[in-house]
């Protein structure tokens, strides 16, 4: 009976076959998570309805059909629709998605795969920014087809404003989605979405507003984002609206960092 020759241990350096587990590169980890989040986001019909179909229908319908007596409807409707699209993707979409991910234990399972909590949140933020970028390109093309006059400088400045709005609404969406129950989130997120759309549309088409009602309406994040985008498209900066957005964003991010949970309390 013959035996196989033994390998010469001197052929391999000591430790060659020793396990060396380590975390993946941070940038690669975040981008992989963002790609996963983006694919999941666009596979949901409700997300498509909130982020693309409804805002697009509002843009085309309110410009083509004289529902409101506006001298230049596109100048008022276009910034408003952009703000609503950001709110839909960052707030309503994320709140509902995160809430049901928590409800069914998806976030816990992702965490068990080695992705840290900050990686999950960062991936969601990058995913929303990607969605908002695609929205902006699509709605800009439709706006141009409807007769909008967009300068390169104003278009880029408005994009910066939309990214600021993305930070604000995503932080608020993560706050709601990471603290409440899934069923409550579903109803409350949609209710707030409808209220903010109504307030933003009212401000955009109203002939003039003054007094305390005007002040209160312009403190809403959706109205403030509309003001920022409208000013940016005209190559200007609406500093008071920027300040309102920063306050909302910092407040939402701070509260989300403090109270966000990756599972339901009874899990």
Regions inferred by a protein language model and the residue ranges of each:
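Transmembrane helix-boundary elements of multi-pass transport/secretion proteins
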Residues: 19-25, 29, 33-104, 153-158, ...
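Short hydrophobic, aromatic-rich alpha-helical segments embedded in or entering the lipid bilayer
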Residues: 2-6, 27-33, 204-242
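ABC-family P-loop ATPase nucleotide-binding domain
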Residues: 1-26
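Transmembrane helix-loop junction
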Residues: 63-67, 100, 109, 144, ...
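Transmembrane helix segments
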Residues: 61-68, 177-219
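Alpha-helical transmembrane segments and their short interhelical loops
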Residues: 117-188, 236-246, 250-254
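Alpha-helical transmembrane segments of multipass membrane proteins
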Residues: 37, 59-60, 64, 140-145, ...
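Hydrophobic alpha-helical transmembrane segments of multi-pass membrane transport proteins
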Residues: 57-61, 74-146, 197
């Amino acid at each position: 009976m013959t035996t196989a020759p033994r390998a010469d241990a001197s052929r391999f350096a000591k430790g060659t076959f020793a396990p060396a587990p380590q975390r993946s590169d941070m940038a690669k980890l975040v981008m992989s998570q963002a790609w996963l989040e983006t694919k999941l986001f666009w596979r949901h019909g409700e997300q498509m309805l909130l982020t693309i179909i409804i805002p697009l229908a509002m843009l085309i319908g309110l410009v083509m059909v004289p529902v409101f007596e506006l001298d230049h409807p596109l100048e008022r409707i276009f910034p408003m629709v952009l703000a609503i699209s950001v709110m839909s993707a960052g707030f309503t979409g994320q709140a509902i998605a995160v809430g049901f991910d928590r409800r069914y234990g998806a976030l816990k399972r992702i965490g068990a795969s080695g992705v840290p909590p900050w990686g999950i949140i960062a991936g969601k933020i990058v995913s929303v920014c990607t969605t908002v970028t695609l929205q902006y390109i699509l709605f800009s093309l439709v706006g141009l087809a409807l007769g909008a006059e967009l300068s390169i400088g104003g278009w880029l400045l408005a994009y910066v404003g939309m990214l600021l709005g993305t930070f604000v609404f995503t932080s608020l969406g993560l706050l709601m989605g990471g603290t409440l129950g899934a069923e409550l989130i579903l109803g409350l997120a949609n209710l707030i979405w409808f209220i903010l759309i109504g307030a933003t549309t009212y401000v955009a088409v109203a002939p003039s507003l003054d007094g305390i009602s005007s002040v209160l309406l312009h403190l809403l994040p959706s109205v403030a984002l509309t003001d920022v985008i409208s000013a940016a498209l005209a190559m200007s900066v609406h500093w008071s609206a920027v300040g309102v957005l920063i306050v909302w964003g910092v407040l939402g991010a701070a509260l989300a960092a403090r109270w966000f949970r990756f599972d339901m309390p009874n899990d």
